Design a protein with these regions (language model features):
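Hinge/lid segment of periplasmic solute-binding proteins
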Residues: 43-54, 122-177, 320-329, 393-396, ...
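Long, aromatic- and glycine/proline-rich binding clefts that accommodate carbohydrate-like moieties
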Residues: 323-327, 376-431, 435
């Protein structure tokens, strides 16, 4: 059995716009007056609609998962102040969820006919879970707004169900990655295995680095954390990228984990000294151990973690070692990163007035030119609007965000989290890793995962 690490605490893309141009034509005075009248009428209707929108009155409840500072009440209060300056009669109360018990809280509220009006998370929950159950409002009209025309097509597709209904309106996106402790790598002469210009490495060099670090005395180099679903995008990306395995088919209709590529990856991880499967850890715990020097690498990283200053200087461990973000190792050095998309959904609580107010909230937070920048900044991630540029210009995080934009976001991979049965598949994944870490046969456990996950996908 692989040795268990003691956890010290938890911490927790593209399109071109088409423009149609019409040549000028001669018009009569009558035509001009008619056109002018239509324009005035349209402007009047638009102004009236805007007035009615801003005059909405409603009490809304928003549930939000800890998406960057959207999990911080002071930060969200500031955003709500901006919203209430325009919509003084829409009152939004917020309940802050975590990734350990958040799903249970939402499901309990649904069962008690007390679902929130608004919820902020990703398509795997809003589209593939609650949307697929018919609990969410179709937001197709929001995507018909001019303000939605520059959202990356792959993001739009991720927000749409297999029936063609849109259950999420996106705000921000990220490509998750891993990170290494530069000092630990220097001491073990392991920097030679990294392409630091591109932040990439090969599978072969990854295992060479692990060996070098372990031989130098780093007992715990990498933790394959499997105590729950928190941060599981890291373990999925590691296993899939090592030898080119997949998690689902391209159509997102079934799971495809049971493959020779994934089996080889897991077998090599089990064998490697310094890589430990730990059923006591989830992603947040692993980050804590990486920051305090217990681990030399983290599988649960992104730009928000790189910018985090909770325990000291951004981009440094607790004792000041430099943290270098890296793509996951791949056989050819070309990894596909698991992506995250976050936005808003509306539960169908049968109150049309609340739905209108909730849509006004979404439009303001995600589409308003100035507010959207602040909303995205609060996530610590990247805008889904192609034309929403310079979000971090002039901020202390500008350099880091530029690095991630150039080196990591182009590797945003397939967004397979919308595959049916996703909630079950996530649970099956960490349970499978636990059994493998405890000595279970890799091939047998992969087959068990795929059987159970695909049964859920077809249910």
């Amino acid at each position: 059995m692989k040795k268990r690490i003691l956890a010290w605490g938890a911490a927790s893309l593209l399109l071109a716009s088409s423009l149609a141009a019409c040549g000028p034509k001669a018009t009569t005075e009558t035509e001009k007056k008619a056109e002018s009248g239509k324009a005035s009428e349209a402007a009047s209707e638009k102004a009236e609609g805007a007035f009615e929108d801003e005059a909405l009155k409603a009490d809304l409840k928003l549930y939000t998962y800890p998406i960057g500072k959207w999990g911080d009440s002071a930060s969200v209060d500031s955003l709500l102040q901006n919203f209430n300056a325009k919509y003084p009669d829409i009152h939004v109360t917020v309940e802050y969820l975590d990734y350990q018990s958040g799903d249970d809280q939402v499901n309990t509220a649904i069962e008690g006919n007390a679902a929130p009006d608004l919820i902020m998370e990703g398509p795997e929950r809003l589209v593939a879970n609650w949307g697929a159950k018919g609990l969410m409002v179709d937001l197709a009209d929001l995507f018909e707004d001019d303000a939605a025309k520059d959202i990356y097509p792959n993001v739009v597709e991720a927000c749409k169900s297999s029936e063609g209904k849109y259950y999420e309106y996106p705000l921000a996106m990220i490509a998750h990655c891993m990170a290494i402790n530069k000092t630990a790598f220097e001491n073990a002469d392991a920097l030679q295995y990294l392409d630091l210009d591109n932040h990439t490495w090969t599978t072969e060099n990854f295992f060479k680095a692990v060996k070098a670090l372990h031989d130098k005395g780093q007992e715990n180099v990498v933790a394959v954390y499997c105590g729950g679903q928190g941060g599981d995008q890291g373990t999925r990306a590691l296993v899939n990228n090592l030898y080119g395995g997949k998690f689902t088919n391209k159509e997102h209709t079934e799971y495809a984990v049971d493959s020779s590529e994934n089996a080889q990856a897991l077998e090599e991880l089990v064998k490697a000294e310094g890589i430990n499967f730990d059923p006591a850890l989830v992603g947040g715990d692993e980050i804590t151990l990486f920051r305090n020097g217990t681990l030399a690498m983290s599988l649960c990283w992104n730009s928000a973690q790189q910018n985090n200053k909770d325990n000291g200087e951004a981009g440094k461990t607790n004792n000041g070692d430099e943290i270098i973000p890296m793509l996951f190792p791949a056989k050819d050095g070309k990894a596909e990163l698991c992506g995250g998309i976050w936005g808003f959904g509306i539960f169908d609580n049968g109150d049309e007035n609340k739905v209108k107010a909730a849509k006004a909230f979404i439009r303001f937070m995600a589409n308003d030119a100035e507010q959207a920048k602040l909303s995205v900044q609060t996530t610590g991630f990247f805008p889904v609007h192609k034309d929403l540029t310079d979000v971090y210009e002039g901020t202390e995080n500008a350099e880091t965000m530029k690095l991630f934009t150039e080196k990591f976001m182009p590797s945003f991979g397939d967004y397979y989290q919308v595959t049916p049965g996703w909630a079950t598949a996530r649970t099956e994944w960490w349970n499978m890793l636990q059994r493998i870490g405890q000595g279970g046969d890799v091939k047998t456990e992969l087959t068990t995962f795929q059987t159970n996950a695909n049964a859920a996908a077809k249910a």
